[in-house]
Amino acid sequence: MKVLSVFNQKGGVGKTTTTINLGAAFALMMSHEAGANEEPGRVLIIDLDQQTHSEITLSGGFFGQRRQTGLGPYDNIAGLLMMDTALPVTDIIRTSEIPHGARRNMDFIPSSKEKMPNVDTALKNDPIDGLFRLRGILETVEPFYQYVVIDNPPGLSYLSINSLVGSTHVVIPCQLEAPSIEGLTSALKTIQSVQRQHNPRLQFLGILPSMCDFRQQEQNEFLASLHGQYNSLILTPISRRADVSYANSEGLDIFSFKPARRSDQLMSANPATQEFARVAEEIRQRMG
């Protein structure tokens, strides 16, 4: 099982959008690869951000009809991390309605906007295994999933460290703006620290330029600078596009919002689907 942490200590860099669309791309790819009588591999999305935007998208979107999970107030990722739910994780996981065109092979663990703010303190108060709670949850679901994609909170917290400790791979979305690029150093230092102290198997896959607007000369210069410094670690840039925002609001990934004409194809003529498909393929190849 490959566990991909979408990580950056800076907020507003596109972590949630990256998480949803990479997960959808992986699910669609495995659906297309599976034979007619074969079960495709499965993807699990985990939302560790207190804003719970990934979970909102997977549950119907900001403006859509929110789907009810039928679970109690602690039967979610917060309750699992704080050990406040009596249910096993396999009873809490729900199947996402997206991506359309896949064979219902993307799941998510429900989150809780009310409970998530309490999780970091609970983890911090457990000096023995507070950094390893998520790893334990992931070990439980390992037989069922090929990919797990984790949306992380901004800042450096026990939640984000849990994510890195439990992951096999990590990618850093980064806007082509000075504050975001300056924050890369901190993010890379955190990853290296976790690799040394807690998780030597964690592999850094690269930097994902996100929400790019190449009409601005400054952004072209920043991208050239990143290529000069990090070379092959720079992934295909994702442009800022209205369709991506509209898709999030409707509770859809970009591949469902702008689907391909043929059900066995991932990309449509829409540029956003093409960019995310290229990034997903790059990341999948780097994960092996």
What are these regions (language model features)?
Residues 1-288:
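P-loop NTP-binding core
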